[in-house]
């Protein structure tokens, strides 16, 4: 079930299809790749965990280790991206890894991490939908989605720039955005489990660093 969930939710190493599936108009991309289709994998895994009895810890280890690998991979892959929609594809890959991370932590007994992961499914859907619609607005207005050509967005198009800023702060989990509360639960649950497990503590720290780096990177385009 976990392997199938990785494929449906574009987790490493089964991520290849998502960045190449961005040719649709942005409202379609917002619905399929932001709000619905890619969420099926994490929903199936969450349902499986909720309905199962005792789950072997190896399932949790595989889930959280692959989640951290996917976070870092997604972050490194969207750094060189120039096309905003491809950037959002890799961002989605990384954000869904947060959900898998929280679900994996629940195997070790963290109900808080599980709740945060499920909440993040919905929060990310709204946030990423806004980002895709911003990409569509820019493409319609400027005739391009290439990031170097839209740098300094806040000065040129303040309304769209504000929308971009809201989406960027939400993706990063800056309070009072809804994603702050879901990420906070995942991270808090991770540190609670990590108090008795050094490896998990380190993995949670990596997640925090990746979250901060993501926000810093998005700020450069505003």
Model-derived regions: residue spans:
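Hydrophobic transmembrane alpha-helices and their helix-loop junctions in integral membrane proteins
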Residues: 1-221
């Amino acid at each position: 079930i976990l392997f199938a969930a990785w494929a449906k939710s574009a987790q490493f190493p089964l991520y290849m299809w998502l960045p190449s599936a961005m040719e649709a108009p942005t409202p379609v991309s917002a619905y399929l790749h932001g709000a619905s289709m890619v969420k099926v994998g994490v929903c199936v895994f969450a349902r499986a965990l909720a309905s199962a009895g005792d789950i072997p810890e190896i399932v949790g280890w595989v889930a959280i280790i692959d989640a951290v690998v996917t976070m870092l991979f997604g972050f490194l892959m969207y750094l060189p991206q120039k096309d905003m929609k491809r950037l959002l594809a890799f961002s989605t890959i990384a954000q869904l890894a947060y959900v898998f991370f929280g679900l994996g932590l629940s195997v070790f007994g963290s109900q808080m991490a599980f709740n945060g992961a499920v909440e993040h499914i919905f929060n990310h859907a709204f946030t990423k939908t806004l980002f895709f619609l911003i990409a569509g607005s820019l493409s319609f207005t400027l005739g391009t989605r290439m990031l170097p050509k839209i740098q300094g967005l806040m000065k040129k198009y303040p309304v769209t720039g504000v929308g971009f800023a809201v989406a960027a702060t939400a993706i990063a989990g800056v309070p009072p955005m809804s994603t702050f509360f879901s990420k906070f639960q995942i991270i808090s649950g991770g540190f609670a489990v990590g108090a008795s497990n050094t490896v998990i503590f380190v993995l949670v720290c990596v997640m925090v660093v990746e979250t901060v780096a993501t926000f810093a990177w998005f700020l450069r385009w505003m």
